Amino acid sequence: MIYLKILEKLNQAIWLFDINKRVLIWGNQSCKKYKNIESITSLFNNSNLINDIRNGKSKHEHIDIIESNENGEILKQMIFKYSSIHISDMDARQLYLDTSINLLVNQDSHYLDYEGKRIFILVEAIEEIKFIQSPLSSSIENHNINNNQNNQNSVNINSSNKGQYNRPEPSNMGSWEWNVQNDTTKASNQFYKIIGIENDFNKKLNFNDFINKLGIQEIQPIINNCIESNSSSFEYPLRINRKNDNLVRYIQLKGEIIKKDDKVFKVLGVCHDFSEIQEAKDKLEEESKFVEALIGCLKAGIVACNSNGDLTHFNKSAQDLHGLELNDKTDRKQLLDQILKCYRSPYEQINLEKSGTPIIRALSGEFINDQEIIITPTSNQQQSSLSKSNRPRSQSNCSNGNKSQNRLSKNYSTTTTTTNNNNNNNNNNNNNNNNNNNNNSISQQQQTQVSTQQTQQQQNTTNGIGGATTSTTAAAATITSPQQIPIATKIPTKINDNEFLVLASGQEIVSKDGKTIGAFVALHDITERKRNEVILKNATEEAQRANQLKGEFLANISHELLSPMNSIIGMVGLCLDVAPRNLKEMLNDVVESSKILLDLLHQILDFTTLESNSLAVRPFPFKLRDTFNQLFKVFYTRIIEKKISLTFSIDPNIADDFYGDQNRLKQILSNLIDNAIKFSNSSNINNSISIIVEQLTHNQFKKYKDSFRSNSKTHSRLNSHDDYSIDGDYDDQDNNDSYFGRDINVSDNESAVGGFSELDEKDNSDDDDENDDENDETDENDDDTDDDTSSNTSRNNISNNLLFHNNTSGGGGGGINKREKFKKKDREGFVNLKFSIKDRGIGVPEDKHDFIFDRFFQVDGSYSRVQGGVGLGLSICKKLIEFFGGAIWFESEASQGSTFHFILSIKSVEAPSPKSPSLQSSNGSINSTTKLFESSRLKNEIYIPSLPNVQTKKVKKDSNDNGNNDSTNYGISLSNSMNNININGSTLNNNNSINNNNNSNDNGPLTSRTPSNSYYNFIASLNNTSLKSSSHNTLSSSPTGFNGISNLNISGLNNLSNLSNNPNNLNNIIGNTNGNNNTNGNNNSGISLNNSNNNIQTPNGLNNSRGSSLISTPSTKNVKKQHSCPMDLIQRIHSICTPRGPISKECGLNNLPAYSPPKSPGRSLSHGGKNYSNLISTPRGGVGYSSPPINSSSSSGGGSSTNGSNSGNSSANNSTPSSSSLSSTPLTSSNTPSPVSISSNNVNNNNQQQQTQPILSPILPLKDNSIDISDLNNINSLTPNSSNSTSTNVTQSSSNIINNGNSITIINNNPVTPNGKKIVIVPLLSLQSASSPKQSQRGYSPKQQYSPKQYSPKQQYSPKQYSPKQQQQQQQQQQQLEQLSGRMSPHKSNLSSTNLHHIHHHHIHQQQSQQHNNTTVHSNNLILNNNNNNNNNNNNNNNNNNNNNNNNNNNNNNTTNTSNNHTSDPSKSSNSTPETSPPISSPRSNNNNNCSLTTIVGVTTPPQPSSTITTPQFQSPPILSGNSGNINLLSSNGTSSGGIEISGSQMIPQKVLVAEDNTMNQKLIKTLLTKRGFDITIAKDGKQALDFYHESKNKSILYDCILMDIQMPILSGLEATCAIREIEANEGGHIPIIAVTAHAMKGDKEKFLESGVDDYVTKPINPKLLYEVINTQICKYIEENRSSSTINENKNTINNNNNNTNNNNNNNNSSNPVNNNNSNSIDATQQELNNEKIRI
């Protein structure tokens, strides 16, 4: 207590404050001059200040305090320092008991009952800052002058006047005095400074002069009014301009009138300069306006009130929420009551009590944070002060409330509240001192309905400080917080349409002295958000249910999908064992397609399994190198195809025996190797794949895993919100380590991550192997018993045993020491492996790196992408690796290749694992289960079978094993150079270097380990292996089973005719290259297999000439839509092709897309391996065709070769002009009719040998008697069959005919058999189009056909060009045709059946046209084929040479055959009859048409050396169907046929371009359309389709229809379609394009039709629907293009040829082709025919 005595005598004011009771208990003598000590106590209501002081921190605070002195009371601003002190209990008692201590509290307080330390706060006045109020204000304000005290007051004032003006005054305060009796004025020096003038003390001024000098004349009337009103004081504010500097100053004049003897004696006054205060007020008012505007603009509703319950702020958003309005006339207190009635709980249907409303809770000191409440707007409330607002919520720049009423800017003193316990209505009488020093008594009644606590009442303590009585009051009106609503346990109620769900946030507003001056609440409308959350929640739940159902569906459907696929593959495999050779190819295609589908199903099911956390791990012992052996066996053929050099390197220190799920490891490696092969570039000379397996230390493994571990979800472009991560223990445990998981179905406390599985706790102690004991000697003795039982326990508990491991602790229990020991031993029992697969493929662009592991992501996802797939492979790999506790990453650069790395920790076992049943077979076939690549004694050596040019490579690598001196790492190298392999027949005949000696030297481990005949067995058996389909067509197209051999050119081998019958004979010819494992490695057998299609060139002279058609004539007026080609597509086409021709002006370019002339489509006839001994049946209503090979004959002057362009296969083959071609492959499938071809030497005018093209000849189906050409080895068997037979079968190729010595004799240019049987001869008339420039922009319109006036008499055929001998030959030919055709009389016609003709339009390639010069193309003479001598008779129609009118059925056939002459002399045709009708232009040809007649025999005949072939090759035969005169593409049985019926009996094959990249689909579509007689051309991508289209336009042989696949490499189907439509828009015409695609989702059809296609057929293809669509589209454009003008012209042509009608068959074979001018009228049949034609 001694220091208290010392503090009491200090001049500084010091107080002592009890921190626990929060009362001021003591003060020294210096503090007695300060009156408002309650302002000090109010600071201790701040809990933060109390805590800081309690913790020993010193605080400095600014406090406004009133000081009482002899001059009165002065309001000062002081700085007080707060610090904590500790007082013992004894001192505290002495403090409270000592009456001499200046205690500020009552001593009867029970402070002695407090337990613990006494902590007091010492408050020390540090510094006085400045005066706040004038020293006279308080005295004037509180001084009352009564008439009874005038004398005494007068004396006091007189006694104090002496030193009044000499004492110092504040700088902003001045005083003045007016002696009324003497009329003199005095003022202080500070007063003059405020006014801005100098004080003249010597000069006496009266009052008028004084106020005039100062410029305050306004004060005089105020004083006069005050005197007259008997008032004692006055106050008046002034705004003046200071005299010396003209500054605006705000002053306030205050005065007091002193009377003496009821007379005014003096007027005392002060002048207060409050300019700084006024400026602060102005600034505050500006800020207040800014705040008002800001609050009004907020979207959230703001509700604020002061401590008296008056509403201060209510912005526009809040008004809309509550349905109320605030204006100047609104009673704010009543408005607040209305606001409180709008709230209700979101969990109940009743309104909140006022105590629970946010504004009341905030006013009571509670912090409101996002409380959900429902606001029900006030309705039907018509009051003068309140109005309902139903306007929509909007932001408004408005300032709310009365501007003059700013409650927040005032200082309120503490309110004394009297609480009535029986009533909640409290009357609060507050005495407040405002800044204007007005005595205002504010009586406020605050109505509340809240449950309140009784507030503490501060006792008024009378203290002797300056003799004054201090009334200390403490405000204590505290409102208790309402009960908290347990939101989590309640269910939200429904929100009505007229209600709002809001989030309320608010708090109280506290003044500087700690008083609560108000509160505010912000209301955020979340109604829409909540509704959207409900919708989203329902949608999420629905999606989760759908996802669950999807997973269950896929899990259940897996059996239903895999079972039929297994049946399909199995049954087809059984069929392969017994099927004939011609069906095996198609069955193999079925197997390959089924396996592709099966692989896709497995991928989808695996991904679904990983997604649904139902992955089952099936561990078993396996050998690592055997795993790679099996993978190399699967991918070997594809490696050969893509010409990849594969290098496999494995660390020799890595053991071979492991325990885990081998199938999952193979799945990961298979996906990565498959991608490396798929995206490799075969044209790259450095095309290679490198596979490296390394062993990592634990630290390296951990470093890789921490660096590349996926810590977040993969990027997803469209489904980023989906989380498909495995629910495993992926969190960081023990430095991001965790054990590899067991089966997913284990319990949750056992971590399902890590290598493959984790041991149970009971297995933890049993898993100590020998390596563990060696590395941990301290545990050796303790674990001997466990080691003895470890093998049995770990083997029996396979599902719970460790497979792959991640070097961390897993789940389970057990002690700490045992667990630490388990972790150490597990790390030692696992091997950390790093796998790297490096390729030199296309790489991954940098911007796609983040998405490469996303599901369904593809680097190129466009329709024109080269590689297929669904984009699940890498995603499955990533999920599997992460599921097993590993990590995967990659390094890639565009066009430089990619390297994929992944790490796994795999359980290593010492004991040799038992052999899998799948590895016990010893069969050497690749189809067996024997390892393809045998492992040597060294674990790191793996070998492959010996193949030509396949080398083994040593990969040297520094070994990381300590103490291991073997630094050589032997790896395998699969160097695929099959592109250099070629089989050369001449080499086989002349080079007898094939050595079967068993004593040859080995040239390496590859040769030594290859079994006998392994080369053939290996290659031939690849057809049956489960390999994925390659993008190349060569492997699947080889009929001999030699996948990879696409071309067999055997030029000098005469004894290979039986090779096709027995493919195994090729081994006898080639020889045993291995020689029972002792074959000389340096032996060169001269055998090479060419697997490259890039170097194949079409020989000179082989042209793919196409016939014309009357279909798909381009029409300008029928093109309804203009398909504009996008600029990016044009740029792509320009980058692919070379410029040629003009382009549409709409595109802004001057050149058409590039169309380099493609190679003639088709497959070579010299495709060795099979003979033509298969039966080909003719479809109903059609003509059977066979495609015999071109035989080599020693008697012929030169061999012949074919172009092999049948069915539009795009791969051509090499052939030499002087070599014979062995034809052994059918041009069509086994169930498809193949055209019969006859080839002979083609000699031009210069007697130069040229290669010829096969001629496809139709075999005429006879309606009554048909010739069964079933065995050409015995021609005597050619006898007519029964009348019901409609098919002709060709059972043997012409090569066998020659070998067996059979021959066909040509009698009168007609073939007959040795026994005199005649062969059916069908004359084939074709229109040849000369190449000529376009006549107009749209040169394909039917209106541009030649009229009869355009033909001169010289262009007509003259009878003189046929000699009598030739006419006689023609008559004999017609007679033979009659005998063979039997009763082939046409319906509704009296004409002879021998007059049937079949029209076929064709075109000769420009190159062939140049070779023939004026013989075929530029000549209008009749060209006769002396070899074939065929007259094609269709329904008794005799075609005149120049009258090629489709509607003229009665024209005489005035053609004769010239022997040994190929062209007619133009001079001999001068006597032609001018009345003949002109030929009709073909819609697929240009305007300059030349007519030629070619006869094609129905069976094969020996080649004639002296004949010249001028007829081009036809891909498919014409079809005979029906006799209707209408255009019809349906045969008599209602099925679609590939020809158009003309003149009731003539059919023209339709040319169809098929754009398809899939080989299997190419074969299917080709077979389907060829069966119906369509002429097919196959394009393997969009660019080639565009090339073929452009080539057809250049040759004026347009396609009738295009079947366009959508997704194709280089150019997609949509891009090719857009380019074709752009060309048509520029040049005219329109060709039907039918989309044939597997894209069958909603919207695909509309998108395709919008791009320019005419129709749409989905895959799998429905043949009936495909025929119907083709028929509809072709007929549609035929009807549009064949305008009425053409029909009228044909009608006139028929009328002009009425005189040429011949009713007798004798006129058909007339020797002189003269016009018969018979006067007979057209018979009834002709009239009916004309009527039918007119109806078209």
UniProtKB/Swiss-Prot annotation:
Family annotation (InterPro entries): CheY-like_superfamily, HATPase_C_sf, His_kinase_dom, HisK_dim/P_dom, HisK_dim/P_sf, PAS-assoc_C, PAS-like_dom_sf, Sig_transdc_His_kin-like_C
Family matches, as PROSITE patterns: HIS_KIN, PAC, RESPONSE_REGULATORY
A molecular-function term among this protein's GO annotations: ATP binding
Domain PAC, residue spans: 234-286
Domain Histidine kinase span(s) in chain numbering: 556-908
Superkingdom as given in the UniProt entry: Eukaryota
PANTHER family, per the entry: HISTIDINE KINASE (PTHR45339:SF5), HYBRID SIGNAL TRANSDUCTION HISTIDINE KINASE J (PTHR45339)
Protein name: Hybrid signal transduction histidine kinase I
Organism: Dictyostelium discoideum (Social amoeba)
Record gene name: dhkI-1
